[in-house]
Amino acid sequence: MTLALHTPGLKDMAYRQRLLSDPETMAYNRGRDFGGAPGYHPETGCIDFPREDWRYWRQVWLLNEPQFFSALLYDEDADCPVGEVTYYFDGEADAHIAGILIEHRHRGKGLCAEGLRLLIEHAFAREDIHVLRAEIPGDNPPALKGYRRAGFHDFGCRDGVHALIFTREDYEK
């Protein structure tokens, strides 16, 4: 499988909608406390992504780099998306928060680490990004393993949530 980052077009938003509404894909998100975030369904972990939000979402996530970035993780051999990668700047953490979501039927193939490596390459090609950070609950061992295999290292753990970071210095080694 050859993976690449693919900038999503408006036609790709239907895939993102299916991804976020799939209970098997979103099971890792089930029961989390997001402070009453609109569109989040704690019983399934799914997140609403209605069609009327697509253009606005694209304006925020695709036209405001380095504040926001999103790309589909694309299997070039099969000519189809297998998930998405993102980052956004968190001023409080003074870091870009990295994320990856792999469609459930493509999990267990090492795509998390490979997709994160592509995200790392993209992020650190920019001079204005210095730290990628992720907060992964301890009850998600596959995600922890994927981030660590991609080169993220532990920064701390509080209330069972692991803070992992990847710095520009890590990238330049």
Regions found by a protein language model. Give the residues of each.
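Conserved catalytic-core motifs of GNAT/GCN5-like acyltransferases
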Residues: 133-136, 148-166
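Alpha-helical elements of Rossmann-like donor-binding domains used by nucleotide-donor carbohydrate transfer enzymes
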Residues: 15-18, 56, 114, 118
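Amphipathic alpha-helical recognition patches that constitute DNA-binding helices
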Residues: 15, 96-97, 101, 115, ...
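Conserved acetyl-CoA-binding loop-helix of GNAT-fold acetyltransferases
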Residues: 102, 108-122, 144-149
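A short beta-loop-alpha structural element at the N-terminal edge
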Residues: 3-21, 26-30
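Conserved beta-strand-loop-alpha-helix junction that forms the acyl-donor binding cleft
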Residues: 103-104, 118, 133-144, 161-162
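Acetyl-CoA-dependent GNAT
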Residues: 10, 26-98, 103-105, 157-158, ...
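Conserved GNAT acetyl-CoA-binding A-motif
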Residues: 125-135
